Amino acid sequence: MTPMQEQLVALGAVFEAAVLADKIARTGQVSEASMSCMLGSLLVRDPQTTLDVYGGDDLNLRDGYRALISSLERNPSALQREPLRYSLAMIGLERQLDKRSDMLQVMGSRLDQIQQQVEHFGLVHDNVIAACGGLYQDTISTFRQRIQVHGDMRFLQQPNNAAKIRALLLAGIRSARLWRQLGGHRWQLVFSRGKLLKALYDMTRN
């Protein structure tokens, strides 16, 4: 993979987390495989490639790529507005998080505890999802900037759905961090749209 493709895997994962959070908010549904991929990305240490963070297969990120492409194409009929809003908010929150070494330390130790829960219960167990959601509440939710997720209140008010959404936002922010570590910048979304789209078309065609 080229450096740009590596970046797009991580950025596609930010959008994937946003798409899944939006889906839960609107329908109350999310596939176990999708949830597993994003939760698993929080716990991967020392991956060989960026794709290894997401199960080694970018089919896991296809909905995120689709949402990212529609955002870069600026096609009003295809644009997924809420996922785009959530994605940009996650990228912004990651910048704030980067200035908080104390919070990053807390997150690292809490994720170690969650890894132990995963070994005991499995990746998509309610206890693991609740722990990830709780970690988001105790850290990212304390920033002044908040992500307001819009959807059907019948689904948003269910504690399990709320925990899933928070866990996905946490995974999205982790992916935004990876994207930036790989050289990603917000200005690329404005000034390098053509290059990003060409690379994305190639990635989604294969």
UniProtKB/Swiss-Prot annotation:
This is High frequency lysogenization protein HflD homolog. Belongs to the HflD family. PANTHER family: HIGH FREQUENCY LYSOGENIZATION PROTEIN HFLD (PTHR38100:SF1). Keywords: Cell inner membrane, Cell membrane, Cytoplasm, Membrane. It holds the Pfam family DUF489. Disulfide bonds: none annotated. It is a peripheral membrane protein. SUPFAM superfamilies: YcfC-like (SSF101322).
